[in-house]
Amino acid sequence: SKIRTADRTYVNHEQGSYESTDGSNDFALAGSGYFCIDTARGIRYTRNGSFSVDDEGFLTLNGMGRVQGTDGQPIRIENEDFTVDERGVISVSQDLGEDGNEAGMRQIGALRVVDFADYEQLHKEDYGMFSTNQAAEEVENP
């Protein structure tokens, strides 16, 4: 047969260009690293930062799973008015409470961003997701 097939697929893990969106829940990683998504098949990794808040208040990657925080748990957003700073720290707005705390922003967690020593061990899955058996290294300042 004269038909040739590729022995393997190459995935480019280098930084791509940024695309501006109107989505307030769309995030991009500067430099290396992957968001951690808690899926039905276990933890998966992606650079896709097009998140939303589900009916239970969790930050999700639509149809894929819940976004993990630095504590290893899915991130629960307490209300729709939240911000994420350049370090991935998530804050929610709070009203003046009975306890006398001032209204303003309160930190509730941070996006878990990890990187890997060997990108060749990342296995490409559907929708820009990756799996691996290698240990993930936490990115300190994503």
Report the location of each language-model feature.
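Small-polar (Ser/Thr/Gly)-enriched, low-hydrophobicity segments
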Residues: K2-S93, E102, R112
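Context-gated lysine
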Residues: K2-R4, K124, E140
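A short beta-strand/turn structural motif
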Residues: N101-D126
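Amphipathic, heptad-repeat alpha-helical segments used for oligomerization and assembly
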Residues: A136-P142
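Short C-terminal domain-edge/linker segments immediately following a structured domain
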Residues: V67-Q68, I90-V92, K124-G128, P142
